[in-house]
């Protein structure tokens, strides 16, 4: 494509591959609503800037998102949910994984959620929690379990928050634990 600087030209090679110069930005929309940047100067990152990304398929059990690490060391791939705001605070939600489908009336329903929150944002005393939510009875998303870091070193609690000793709560080997903690 035409440009006033040859070093900024987008080219196609003999294989039909389209080549963008290093550290340039691909913009989508008249207001650059989405941008894609290949940042060669750091970790060879591909940076997408915009709001939402959808990967769609009408094929059974698709789409599948695969992170493939072929390194022979002991470390694997990572999914990182990074909330990088200017004023982190206690009780901020760091990230969610939502499991959404429809009910028999075609109403969109969140059937499960894994949520991480900040318990204590104090530098040197950071604590977090991971909460597990599931839809119960009328589709209400209810916290069933919380794993929470405490202010003492190496201490973590696991709370089955809906345990009532009769209908809901902790099961061991499929049997509901009927006793409640004092």
Model-derived features: positions:
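Extended, low-complexity, turn-rich repeat/linker tracts enriched in Gly/Pro/Ser/Thr and Asp/Glu
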Residues: 105, 119-122
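Short beta-strand
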Residues: 38
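Short Gly/Ser/Thr-biased coil->beta-strand turn/linker motifs
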Residues: 5-28, 33-35, 43-102, 109-116, ...
């Amino acid at each position: 494509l035409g440009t006033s600087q040859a070093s900024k030209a987008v080219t196609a090679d003999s294989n039909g591959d389209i080549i963008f110069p290093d550290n340039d930005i691909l913009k989508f929309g008249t207001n650059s609503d989405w941008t894609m940047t290949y940042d060669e100067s750091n970790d060879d990152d591909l940076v997408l800037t915009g709001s939402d990304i959808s990967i769609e398929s009408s094929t059974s059990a698709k789409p599948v998102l695969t992170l493939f690490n072929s390194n022979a060391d002991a470390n694997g791939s990572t999914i990182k949910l990074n909330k990088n705001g200017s004023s982190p605070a206690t009780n901020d939600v760091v990230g969610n994984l939502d499991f959404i489908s429809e009910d028999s009336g075609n109403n969109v329903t969140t059937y499960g959620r894994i949520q991480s929150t900040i318990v204590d944002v104090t530098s040197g005393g950071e604590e977090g929690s991971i909460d597990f939510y599931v839809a119960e009875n009328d589709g209400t998303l209810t916290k069933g379990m919380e794993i929470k870091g405490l202010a003492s070193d190496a201490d973590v609690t696991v709370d089955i928050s809906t345990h009532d000793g009769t209908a809901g709560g902790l099961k061991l080997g499929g049997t509901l634990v009927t006793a409640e903690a004092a």
